[in-house]
């Protein structure tokens, strides 16, 4: 864990071994445990079912709201457990979104926008609906298909009334590209770099 955590959150740093998971595997889609407790990019995985960890996250979101932020994007959202994940389940999404949204509404009278990045699928046969009851989610496969078809001169086939994830349009976030579009074997566009586009 970074020494910056020690500087800015000394209490969290002292308890870092309690607040990070002991599971040593890398994140992958083979099992619920591997999806929600595996290490993403070799980073330690927070114990997001711990109420103290949730409290730190809620406080950070409130600080951001106080600075004028009106929405949040959770990177790698599929790697945070849902209420439907059996023995790995938690109330993280309910607690985080309810607390942040309530705080934002009290301050502004408006609704807070929150979405999470779910690349390719939720992994381990998990459902998007476990997330969409609290947040909107990305559908990179639809965006990748549009990009693929347009760059091959097939713009007419780029339009499709159906999202590849099966998520309702009101819950889906699409993009033309992201930092993951060209990322090694996890890149889903079929391009190795932007020069091909």
Across the structure, where does each feature detected by a protein language model lie?
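Glycan-binding loop/region signatures in secreted carbohydrate-active enzymes
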Residues: 1-55, 126, 130-150, 197
């Amino acid at each position: 864990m970074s020494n910056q955590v020690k500087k800015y959150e000394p209490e969290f740093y002292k308890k870092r071994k309690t607040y990070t998971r002991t599971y040593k595997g890398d994140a992958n889609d083979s099992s619920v445990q591997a999806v929600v407790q595996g290490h993403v990019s070799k980073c330690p995985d927070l114990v997001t079912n711990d109420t103290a960890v949730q409290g730190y996250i809620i406080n950070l979101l409130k600080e951001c709201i106080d600075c004028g932020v009106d929405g949040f994007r959770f990177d790698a959202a599929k790697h945070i457990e849902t209420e439907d994940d059996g023995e790995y389940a938690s109330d993280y999404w309910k607690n985080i979104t309810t607390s942040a949204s309530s705080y934002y509404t009290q301050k502004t009278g408006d609704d807070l926008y929150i979405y999470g990045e779910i690349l390719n699928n939720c992994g381990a046969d998990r459902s998007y609906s476990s997330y969409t009851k609290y947040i909107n989610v990305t559908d990179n496969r639809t965006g990748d298909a549009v990009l693929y078809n347009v760059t091959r001169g097939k713009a007419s086939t780029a339009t499709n009334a159906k999202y590849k994830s099966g998520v309702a349009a009101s819950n889906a976030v699409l993009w033309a590209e992201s930092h993951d579009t060209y990322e090694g074997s996890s890149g889903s566009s079929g391009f190795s770099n932007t020069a091909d586009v």
